[in-house]
Amino acid sequence: MTAAAPEAARSAAPQAMSEQHTATMEIIQKRELWRFWMLVFGFGILTGLVAIALFVHQVIQFGEGRPVGLPHQGESPRGSIVDRNGVLLAADRYFYEVSTTPNYFDDDEQRQQVADLLQGLAGIPALETFDLLRTFPDNLYLRLAESISMEAGHRILDEQERLADEPGIHPLLYITLTPAPQRYYPEQRVGAHLLGIMTMLKETTWRRGLYGVEGFYESYLRQRDGVGLTSKTTTPVSSLPADVRRYLPSVAGRDLILTIDRNVQWIAEEELARALELYKAQAGTIIVMEPKTGEVLAMANAPTFDPNAFIESDPAALQNPAVSAQYEPGSVFKIITAAAALDSGVVTPTQKLTDTGSIAVGQRVILNSDRAGHGQVDMTEALARSLNVITAQWSLLMGHRQFYQYIERFGFGKVTEIDLAGEVYGLTKKPGTLDWSLSDLGTNSFGQGLAVTPIQMANAVASIANGGKLMRPYVVKARVLDGAVQVTEPTVLGTTVRPEIAKELTEILVRVVEEGNQAAGVSGYRIAGKSGTAQIPTKEGYTEDDTIVTFVGYAPADDPQFVILVKLERPDASIWAGYTAAPTFAQVARRLFYYYNIPPDNIRLGADNTEQS
C-alpha cells in the first residue's frame, strides 16, 4: 500500500518525456527533406562548438542577467517520501522549461511572431519574450520560462506538430521544451523541518536536498540524471533524433517510508502553535517517540516555514532545532542524575538526605529555586519539589568519574545518530579538562552548565521508559526500490540503567507528576515525567526573567507507548515549566490516548491492578 503512492507520484515524468519524444519524432519525419542537410552541417561543427561553448560561457546569462548552467537533458524524478501510512509528504511534480537558441531567429518579425504564440498557448508574456530574444541574440541557450504546466507544454507541442506540415520552418519550431521536475510538499508546513528542502546548486540546474530527510538521504533519493548534449547545433535541439541528442538513461530515485505519522505530526504542530500563542513563547519544539524502537512519530518546531516557498523564509528558520539547537535543559536533567544515583547504588528510592537549603560544591554555593531548606527528603520529594541541593548531593555521592560516565551512557555530548541532517553533539564538560571544575559536578547535576539537544533529552528519557536501552532514534522506517522494501531495524546503542532501576524510577516519576507536576496529568492514566525551567545564560550571567521550559514524560507508565518532549523558549505568560510546558504535554498526551485508542488504566488493567501498580 505504501509503495504505491511514490510510484503514482512519479508516473508523470516518464510519460511527459515519452509524449514529447513522440511529438518531436513526428515533426522530424515531416521535415525530413531539410533536416538531413542541416544535420550534416551540424555534425561537422558540433565538436568545435561544444569546446567553444564550454570555454567562453560555462555559465550563460538569461532573463535579468541571472546565471544558469547549460541545460542537461532528462532529469529523472527524485524519490518520493511518504509517512508510515502512505500519506505523500514529498514528491516531484513536472513542468516544462521553455528555451531556445536566439540566433535561429532572422529578424524582429520572427521574434514577435513566436512571442505572441507563446503568450497565447502558454501565457508567457510576449513583451518579456521579445525583449529576451532581442537582448541576447547570440546566446547558445536562452531560457524563456522556468516552468509552465504540462498542459501548456502540450499545447505548444501540438501547435509545433501542426506547423510542421506547413512549408518552410516556422519560428515556433525553434522552441525547445524540457520536462523539469520541481519538489512538491503537499502538506506544506507540516513536518517542514523534518523533511528539509530542495535547493539548486549555485550556477547549475542541478537540485540538491538540504537539511532534514532530504539532506541526510540526498544520495539515496537522488537519481543519476541524463547527461545531455549541451552545445548549440545548427538545428533546433527539439528536432534532433535521439541518437544525436544522446544521453544516459535516467535512473529514478528511491522512495522513503518514514516512521512519522502525519496525524501525530499534525497534533504536535497544532498543540505547539497553540502553546506559543497561549504562553507568548518565541519558539518551541515537540517530539513524540516510540520508546521501545526509537521510532520518531512526530517532530514539530515553531516558527516553521513552507518548503514549497522557503526562499521567503528566514534562513535561520530552515535548520531543525530538534537536532541542531542545543540548550541548558535545567531541572528536567534531574531525571538522568536520579537514574544514575539509583543505578550506581549510592542512594535508594526511599533513602532520605538532608536539605538545608544550600550546599557548597567547589567554589560555588548551590541554592534551591525557592531559596528554602526542606529537611529530610527522599528521591520522590526531591524530584517533585525539584531540589537542587539534593540533586547535587547525589552527584557528590557518585563522584565525578561515575557521574560523567552515566552522562555519556545516556548519550549526551555525542550525536544520537538520528538519520537527519544537521545534528549537533551538545556540550558536556569532562573532568581533567581546563574548562571543568568541581563546581560543575554540582551544577551539571541539575542541568546547568551543559547543553543538550531536544532529541538527546527525549531519547535519554526513552531509555528509562523502555527498561534501560538507549536506542538509535530514526525517522526512516523503510526504503523502497523497484518494489523491494528494506525495513530499518531498531538499533540498541547501549544500556543506561538496569531494568529494575528503570522500573523504580518510573514509579517515582509517576508520583512526581501526581504530586509536583499535576498540570501534566491526564485523568485516568498514570504518566511518568518531570518538568525543567532553565535560565538562559548570557555573557553577564543567567537571566532572571527569560527561560527555556521543558517537560518530558511517557505513558502509560506500565507499558509506555510514547515519549513526549515539550520545549518552549522564553514564554512570557509564565517563566515556569509547570505552568507552560507541562499542560502542553498533557494536551498532546490526551490526544494521543484518543488517537491510539488507549483505554484508561482502570479499563485496560482492571481496577485491582491499577491500584497495585
Could you tell me what each predicted segment is?
Residues 1-310, 401-411, 521-522, 537-542, ...:
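Periplasmic/cell-envelope proteins involved in peptidoglycan metabolism and beta-lactam response
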